Structures are given as C-alpha cells and as structure tokens.
Curated annotation (Swiss-Prot):
Lineage: Eukaryota, Fungi, Dikarya, Ascomycota, Pezizomycotina
Details of cofactor binding: Binds 1 copper ion per subunit.
Subcellular location, record wording: Secreted
Species this chain originates from: Emericella nidulans (strain FGSC A4 / ATCC 38163 / CBS 112.46 / NRRL 194 / M139) (Aspergillus nidulans)
Record-given protein name: AA9 family lytic polysaccharide monooxygenase H
Induction annotation: Expression is significantly induced by pectin. Expression is also moderately induced by cellulose. The degenerate binding motif 5'-SYGGRG-3' that binds to creA involved in carbon catabolite repression is present in the promoter.
UniProt keyword Transport present: no
Pfam families per UniProt: AA9
Length: 434
C-alpha cells in the first residue's frame, strides 16, 4: 500500500470513533465511581472491580426486539454482575456519564431500579424485578424527527441524572439506565436498546419495597413506543415499559416528558466546541464508492473523570461498519474507537450524510479540512493546529497524494505520530463536577 493511501486510512481511522456509546462512570451523591469500560476490560486478564455490570457488547452495539425475551435485554449482551457498589442516600442523585452519543440516535431515556434482596454481586439477573423510577421521551414533536430525551442528554455533556426515590428502603439495588434509539424504529425490530446497569447501596430512606417486572417482560417488539416512525410529526409518544412508579421522585432526570411539549432546555447547545479533523471515508460493503464529504459536526462533548479517581488507561482499538436505512436515504459509516484515559477522551467526529451538492465535490475531502489540520503541533488546547513546528499540508487532493508519496518512512511516521498526538493527547476537554 502506498504511503499516501496509508496516511489516508490512518487519518480517517484516527478521526472517526464509535457511533454508539456506553456509561464510563457515575457520580453518586458527589462521589465518582468508575464504570465498565467495554472497549478495554473484556481484553484484560485482571480488570478492576467497578460498579458497572460487565458486558460483551465490544462492538458498542445494541439489543433489538428479537432479544427482548433473552437475558441480553436486562443489562446488555452477556452481562454479568458488577463486583462493587456505589453508595447513595435515598433521595440522592446519580449522574451517569456516557461517551459521546450520536445525535441521529433519537429516543427516550428510562431508568429502573431493582432490589437485589441480598448480595448484588451474585444475584441472578433474571430474577430482578424492575421498577421504573424515571422516564423522559419526546420533548417537542412539531418538526420531525423531533427533540428527544437523548438530545437533552447530549446537551448536558452526554450525561443523565436520576434521583433515587426518598421512600425507597435501604439496601442493595441495581440501577438499570437505558437509551432506546428510534431512528430505525419504523420497522419491527428496528428500535435499538442500550441498557446499562450499575450496583447501588442505598442508605437511609423509608420502607418502600415495590414489586416490579422482570427484564424479559419489559418490552415487546410491537409496543407503541418501540414500533414508531419518528420521521413524521408526532403529537405524543408513549414511553415503553411498565408505568412510572408512583413513589418516583420525578418523570425525567434531565427534563422532558412522555408527551410532546416545548422546552428551552431541549434546544440548548453544549458549551464545549467541536474540533475539525480530516475525515477520509473508505469504501465498504454496501456503501457507495463515492467518498462522503464531511459536514460541520455538532459540538462534541466528552465525559471526564474527577482528579484522583482515574481509571486505568484503555489500550484497545475497535473498528466496525454500520449501515442504517432512513426513509428515502441510506447512510453507511465506518467507525473506529480509540480509547484513552477517562480524563483524556479521544476526539470524536461524526460523518454526516452528504447532500447532492456535497457528493459532487466529494473528491476534495482533504482540501476542505486541510486548514484545520495544517499539521498537528504539541501545543495543547489549540484548535487551529498552528505553531512553530507545524508543516503546512497541500490544499488539493492530488498534491496531498504527491506530498505523502514524497515522504520517507521516518518522515511519514513522525507526521502520523504528530497527528495522533494532536487528536488524542493535546485536544482534551475537561469537565468539572458541580
């Protein structure tokens, strides 16, 4: 493979990260606890004991309607008990921190809790009875596909806060937190469930010990909130699952409700700006041979770990291809995840579907982003990538190819190292806990 082509693949892989997500950690009553890092821990011989349930969704995939009667719907694919618990007082809050959630994956955010009736590290997940304590669905359906709870989660720095009911009896519980993506839900088994579970030790509280619903009976593939076309204007939306427990503290952790309503919070914009990086899509099975031209992406927001509570540095890299069919259009994206320390998350960029005009000019992919990548530098925090050590790249694709071909192996490796350092190490967003 030529140096130019190798460079193209390397830059594309570094710029695109996994399209779905998972909970990296939680903050319970102000204390941070690490979650299960599915992009690293499955490949470790001795993963740490964390509050998040272990699972095997290493492709960052989902559970669809065909899995609603299997154990996978409970806490995700092949989930096993967490070996630690987070302490939270009844009436307290739990903030769940996600990796960047894709904007196209609109849908409700739902929280359940189930008593372990003993040791949560050994409880049989199929016996857990889930009680819904929080739900948020369609916020504004006046313009398809609408504004959803998932959009509020994104605007809140990819996090969601749920209140533990104050009347709940003290003891060991499993919190089941879930996003249901509805972008393909117009077809049966098209909805995508992303359940995440964490162990809690609830203190104080009252005497309430409500009975619930076992995980394999929460949903059916034809439930009104599961089989739904979000690409038509919706006046209302029925959040799937059992009814909200009357002892729950609220109807939604980050605002929004089961029916459509206007909400200023729904249109709030994250304060952390995105970083432009070159995106050079590669040909894949089922995808058009015409390269996709990247369009300006939404602000990227990434979770962080408070100082002094850092999880081990992940080292695993995974790549997968996803093809999704929307009404009248097909979108194929190639995604690669680069894991790093929770305090230094990889820069994430989403490749949007090109318009007809963009497709006509798709051969100038690198040109459109060259000004943002005019060579990565070692200066931290610079969004332009300029500096005394920068090397200006050519501004047209043919010249760029010639430029890469002219590099020696050592020069190319140095350029690649600088690019990856700029993408992964220097471009860091931090978030303070409040």
């Amino acid at each position: 493979m030529s140096v130019a082509r190798t460079a193209g693949f390397a830059l594309a892989s570094a710029a695109i990260v996994a399209g779905h997500g998972y909970v990296t950690g939680i903050v319970a009553d102000g204390t941070y606890y690490g979650g299960y890092l599915v992009n690293q821990y499955p490949y470790s011989n001795d993963p740490p004991a964390v509050v998040g349930w272990a699972e095997d969704a290493t492709d960052l995939g989902f559970v669809d309607g065909s899995g609603y009667t299997s154990g996978d719907i409970i806490c995700h694919k092949d989930a096993t008990n967490a070996q630690a618990s987070a302490t939270v007082a009844a009436g307290g809050t739990v903030e769940l921190q996600w990796t960047e959630w894709p904007e196209s994956h609109h849908g409700p955010v739902i929280d359940y809790i189930a008593s372990c009736n003993g040791d949560c590290t050994t409880v049989d997940k199929t016996t857990l009875e889930w009680v819904k304590i929080s739900e948020s669905g369609l916020v504004d359906g006046s313009s398809a596909p609408g504004t959803w709870a998932s959009d509020n989660l994104i605007s809140n720095n990819n996090s969601w806060t749920v209140t533990i009911p104050s009347s709940l009896a003290a003891g060991g519980y499993v919190l089941r937190h879930e996003i249901i993506a509805l972008h393909s839900a117009g077809n049966e088994n098209g909805a995508q469930n992303y359940p995440q579970c964490v162990n809690l030790e609830v203190t104080g509280g009252g005497s309430a010990s409500p009975s619930g619903t076992v995980g394999t009976e929460l949903y059916t593939p034809t439930d009104p909130g599961i089989l739904v076309n979000i690409y038509t204007s919706l006046d209302s939306y029925t959040i799937p699952g059992p009814a909200l427990w009357d002892g729950a503290s609220s109807s939604g952790g980050n605002s929004g409700s089961g029916s459509a309503s206007s909400s200023a919070a729904a249109t709030s914009t994250p304060t952390t700006p995105s970083v432009s990086v070159p995106v050079i899509p590669t040909a894949s099975s089922g995808a058009s041979s015409t390269p996709l031209v990247p369009t300006p992406s939404a602000p990227a927001v990434t979770p962080s770990v408070p100082a002094g509570n850092q999880a081990p540095q992940p080292t695993y890299t995974s790549t997968y291809i996803e093809t999704e069919t929307l009404p009248g259009q097909t979108v194929t994206s190639t995604t690669t995840e680069y894991a790093s320390e929770p305090t230094q998350p990889a820069v994430e960029t989403q490749v949007a579907q090109p318009s007809e005009t963009e497709a006509a000019t798709s051969t100038s992919t690198v040109t459109e982003t060259a000004s943002a990548t005019a060579a990565p530098t070692g200066s931290s925090g610079s969004s332009s990538g300029s500096g005394s050590s920068s090397t200006e790249l050519p501004t047209d694709s043919s010249s760029l190819s010639d430029y890469f071909s002219s590099l020696s192996a050592e020069e190319f490796l140095n350029l690649l190292k600088e690019t990856l350092k700029w993408l992964v190490t220097d471009k860091v967003h931090a978030r303070s806990l409040h």
